[in-house]
């Protein structure tokens, strides 16, 4: 019992270390991205930083929501089922429940999310969304620490790509005189996203 508790605490510590590195990398990436936006002029500076904070909020919201759903439907990094008493022999049903819950979460916040964050027509955004779904599913099949943290890193990198490819990344409103997106004024492809 004590050994299992120590292993669990060690896992939590490693996970928090990885999560801290995750956030530091995100901060560095977004700072580097914002420093290259030379088109931002003085009248739009307040709107620029306000909407940058909104982008951070959406990212952390989805990250915490994803982790909460993962803990709710699964237990630990080995992908063992959380509800052992539930008579669902097919593990695929748990994946269906997980993604249904994620879609329900998006539906609840559709007015805030779909209009501002998911309005995008770039190929990069679609590629990032597909790979994010794929890598997040692979986390549940990991059976050791290496596989768990490796797939978590894949999700982290894909999240960066996902955010940077969003057309409405800075959510500038044309009615206020700002550009729809400073980054989207030039056509993006898979190879010219700056940090990737």
UniProtKB/Swiss-Prot annotation:
This is Uncharacterized mitochondrial protein ORF2. Its main location: mitochondrion. It is found in: Mitochondrion. Keywords: Mitochondrion. GO terms for cellular component: mitochondrion. It comes from the Eukaryota.
């Amino acid at each position: 019992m004590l050994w299992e508790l120590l292993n669990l605490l060690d896992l939590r510590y490693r996970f928090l270390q990885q999560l801290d590195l995750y956030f530091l990398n995100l901060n560095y990436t977004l700072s580097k991205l914002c420093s290259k936006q030379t088109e931002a002029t003085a009248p739009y500076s307040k709107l620029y930083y306000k909407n940058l904070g909104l982008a951070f909020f959406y990212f952390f919201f989805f990250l915490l929501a994803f982790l909460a759903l993962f803990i709710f439907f699964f237990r630990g990094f080995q992908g063992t089922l959380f509800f052992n008493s539930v008579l669902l022999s097919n593990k695929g049903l748990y994946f269906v429940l997980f993604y249904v819950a994620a879609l329900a979460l998006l539906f609840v916040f559709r007015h805030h999310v779909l209009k501002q964050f998911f309005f995008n027509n770039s190929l990069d955004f679609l590629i990032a969304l597909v790979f994010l779904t794929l890598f997040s599913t692979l986390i549940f099949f990991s059976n050791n620490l290496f596989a768990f943290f490796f797939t978590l890193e894949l999700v982290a990198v894909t999240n960066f790509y996902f955010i940077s490819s969003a057309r409405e990344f800075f959510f500038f409103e044309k009615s206020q005189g700002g550009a729809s997106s400073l980054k989207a004024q030039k056509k993006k492809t898979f190879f010219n996203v700056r940090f990737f």
